[in-house]
């Protein structure tokens, strides 16, 4: 195992075990399969997020910036470039799904080879 989850990238760090730590999700760290991209998020925001609530919708790391701006009540701000993210506050408040119909895509220029972490091409 690597120091921060998933199987280590270097073959001499590995103990030969396949990706099973994310079962039943397919694959793990470094993969675009669900086991490599799906991470839990725990939120506590008294008066806004209902205790014990659960949301299965997705969001991206880019969504945190506009969400934090909205949480802080900042409506007018200048940026050097357009903001890529979408505020996920409607998901927290259970008032809507800003990700509905949103396409996700990744560029993975470095594919794993036959000695990769439990994956053979």
Regions found by a protein language model. Name each.
Residues 38-39:
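Catalytic cores of eukaryotic secretory-pathway lumenal/extracellular enzymes that build
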Residues 6-12, 16-32, 49-53, 57, ...:
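C-terminal cap/loop subdomain of S1 sulfatases and analogous C-terminal strand-loop tails that border
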Residues 3:
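Active-site glycine-centered loops adjacent to acidic/histidine catalytic or metal-binding residues
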